Amino acid sequence: MADTEEENLQSQIDEVEALTSIYGDEWCVIDEAERIFCITVSDSSNKPTWTLCLQVILPAEYPASSPPLYQLNAPWLRGEDRLTLANNLEEIYLQNLGENILYQWVEKIREFLLGKSQTSDPGPCLKSTSEETDVDDDCEIPAEELNESFKNSMLFGLNDSSGVEEIPPIIHGETITDRRSTFQAHLAPVVSPYQVKLILNKLYENKKIATATHNIYAYRIYIKERNSFIQDCEDDGETAAGKRMLHLMQILDARDVMVVVSRWYGGILLGPDRFKHINNCARNILMEHKYCSAGEESSKQTAKSKKVGKECKKKADH
C-alpha cells in the first residue's frame, strides 16, 4: 500500500512537472502540500472568446485507482454544456484507468471551447448573459484565485468514504408570477458537494426546468469537524442573483440545504424586482421546511424593536 502511494506521488510529481513545462504560467500551484492545482483554458491564445478554469486536487490514490477531484468554473458553463463536458472528462478517465490524464483533460476542454467558438454563438464575453443587466459581470476568471469553499469541498470529498450517494428528495415550491415572468424554488437537503451535482442532474431531467431562462442556485453544508461551511452559488446568467441568494441563506443560517430558483422570462423587463422574487421564493421554501434558525427571527425582532423605538420617540416628541 505504501509503495503504491509513493509510486502515485512520484507519478503526480512527474505529471505536474510536464504540465508546467507545457503550459508555463497558465498552470498554477494553489497548495502543493494538498496537491491542489488549477489552469485557465481558452479557445485561443490571442483573443479568447470562451474561457474556463479547471481546478483539481490529486488524491493519494491517483493515478492508480482514483481520478482527480475537479471543479469547472465559468460564468457561462451551465446545463447541457456542463453535463457534456463532465461526461467527456469521465470518459477519458474510464478509457485510461491507472494512467495520468490531466493533459488529456486540459486538451479536451480546449477542444470543447474551440468547438463552441466555431458555432454562431458570439460567446459569453461578447453578449449579455441576461436580458436584464444591473451589475457588470467580468468574463475573466483569475486562475490564481481559489476560494476556501472549493478547497474545503474538495478536501471533504477526499475524506468522505460514504460510497455511492443517493439523490436527496427534491421539494418544489409555489410559483410567483409577475409581468409574465414566473419564478419557482426547488429545495433539497445536502451533506456533500457531490449531492449538489446529483440534484442538478435530476432537475435538468425535467424539460421545463432545463429550459428555464435561469436556474440560480446556492447551497450551504456545515462541516462539524472543522466548524466551517462548504458553500457556493451559481447565477446561471442572472448576474449576482446567486450571491444574493447565498447571502440570504447566510443570514437565515440555513445549513445542509440547497435551493434552486428557476426563472422563466416572459418578455417584460422586471428590473430589481426580479431579485426580490428570487429571494422571496428561496426564503419561503426555506422557512416552510424549517431550514431557518434564529437568524431570521432575530433580524425581525431587531426591526420590530427599532419600529417600536421610533413610535415611542414620536409620542415623546408630541
Curated annotation (Swiss-Prot):
PROSITE patterns per the UniProt record, alphabetical: RWD
Gene Ontology terms: biological process: cellular response to amino acid starvation; GCN2-mediated signaling; intracellular signal transduction; negative regulation of transcription by RNA polymerase II; neuron projection extension; positive regulation of neuron differentiation; regulation of cytoplasmic translational initiation in response to stress
GO CC annotation terms, alphabetical: cytoplasm
Domain RWD stretches: 14-116
Annotated spans, Disordered: 296-318
Database matches in Pfam families: RWD, UPF0029
Coiled coil: none
Keywords: Cytoplasm, Differentiation, Neurogenesis, Repressor, Stress response, Translation regulation
Compartment(s) where it occurs, according to its Swiss-Prot or TrEMBL record: Cytoplasm
Membership in a protein family: Belongs to the IMPACT family.
Its biological purpose: Translational regulator that ensures constant high levels of translation upon a variety of stress conditions, such as amino acid starvation, UV-C irradiation, proteasome inhibitor treatment and glucose deprivation. Plays a role as a negative regulator of the EIF2AK4/GCN2 kinase activity; impairs GCN1-mediated EIF2AK4/GCN2 activation, and hence EIF2AK4/GCN2-mediated eIF-2-alpha phosphorylation and subsequent down-regulation of protein synthesis. Plays a role in differentiation of neuronal cells by stimulating neurite outgrowth.
The name this protein goes by in its record: Protein IMPACT-A
Species this chain originates from: Xenopus tropicalis (Western clawed frog)
Gene: impact-A
